[in-house]
């Protein structure tokens, strides 16, 4: 059994290892620790420092690493596990992997719907910040004698952010305080203390008209409106289009997120506006939405992002071309083959290889991986 190729995946912490051997049982397995009953090559891989789990299906492995581990260190060890190290280990003159590449996951800790702490997780660190004391005090007031605080607290996913983690924390804190103003806390406490609401997170979903939104002068109110907006429809596009011109980055970013929920090619021109936003966080979010929608019609716009000054944006463009591209994108890919970011360069190489080999994109397989039982 040999490695045919190694490909990146939508997750910076997962690599796909394509093998020369295809499983005949058509089953899949997830391995997380070395055990005698497992295949020897699986145990060898799990013994590599930094590897946390392996998903094996058909003719490939999905290898997960710790966020703090570097692929540039791990990949040669993976290759060496399959064949003689002297033959497999290659002289790699790639730039060092930037540990701040990719997403910063933002989460909000709540108790009965009352927020009181923010957590950010990047590739190499975790940062937490408590909300102002008023929020902690109100959270305490919402407790009853029968509450199990550890069991009842919940982490709310605020989505991904991009950039310097300290600057991201400042931005997320500003967003949270705008979304949950102090004036709203008594309402949250009242709801938390009501019978049958002990474990429920309270959400204020409210639809507003374009005129009502346009009349809002305070950006915090505009952001709160978008954060509490129900799933948008085509009728909401004018409002969201207006939000794309907002002076505040969080408002523009949330408008992009909402536009991405309208699963239609008709919203592509609005997402293209996001691709040209002055904020790299908005550009990357727009690229993520386009990637999730998967419309090949967006290829010309995504190709332009290969020249973006931010590698997090270039990586998303290369990943989309890997998933949806064809021979028309080869000249652009080859023109950017020497990208100075390791992850971007690797993704461009894989896109070129897939297109030239005539291989199909494996979106259905990524869904299988995402839904696998771990």
UniProtKB/Swiss-Prot annotation:
What highest taxon heads this organism's lineage?
Bacteria
Q: Which UniProt keywords apply?
A: Virulence
Query: Which SMART domains does its entry note?
Result: EZ_HEAT, Nfu_N
GO molecular function terms listed in the Swiss-Prot or TrEMBL record = oxidoreductase activity
| Family statement | Belongs to the CvfC family.
Report the function annotation for this chain: Required for hemolysin production.
Q: What is this protein called?
A: Conserved virulence factor C
Its lineage reads: Bacteria, Bacillati, Bacillota, Bacilli, Bacillales
- What gene does this protein come from? cvfC
